[in-house]
Amino acid sequence: SKHHTIYYNSTTDDVVKSKKQDFTLPDDYQIIKHTPLNYLIRFLASGFAYLFTYGVMHVKVIGRDKLSKYKDEGYFVYGNHTQMVNDVFMPLTLFGWKNYYAIANQANWGIPVIGKTLLPYGGLPVGKNIKQAIKLLKAVKTLTKENAHIVIYPEAHVWPYYTGIRL
């Protein structure tokens, strides 16, 4: 069968875990990178995102036009984290490769490929200590002034294809 059942005890359970769930970035990690390599990686990732999102995953986006009128303004998007891989790529197809950022748990930087090649160029790591938390808040403030589009998955855990609200 293609389907399997996932059991949980509370809506805060982490039902999908990475091998490096306790991965921690150094305190001196540079969050915002405005470099030619940054733009190249983002551009290439965006092309892959279109192919993967629409060609492989067959995603259909309803209401895309509502976002396009705000493309030159900064905004936050709150969404359910429902797909292990495509939640990283699909926003690139919706918000553009230049201005898209995502607030993410540091464990994601420990994931092979995505954590090493994509997150360093658009991920905003949630701080694990006060110094890192302040750094994140400053980065968000800077990006807000730059009209960035910031995605937040507030439940902080992947629940495959779950569409309900978890508090």
Question: Which ranges hold each PLM region?
Answer:
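Membrane-anchoring hydrophobic helices of lipid-metabolizing enzymes
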Residues: 1-81, 86-90, 99, 115-121
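Soluble catalytic domains of membrane acyltransferases
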Residues: 58-167
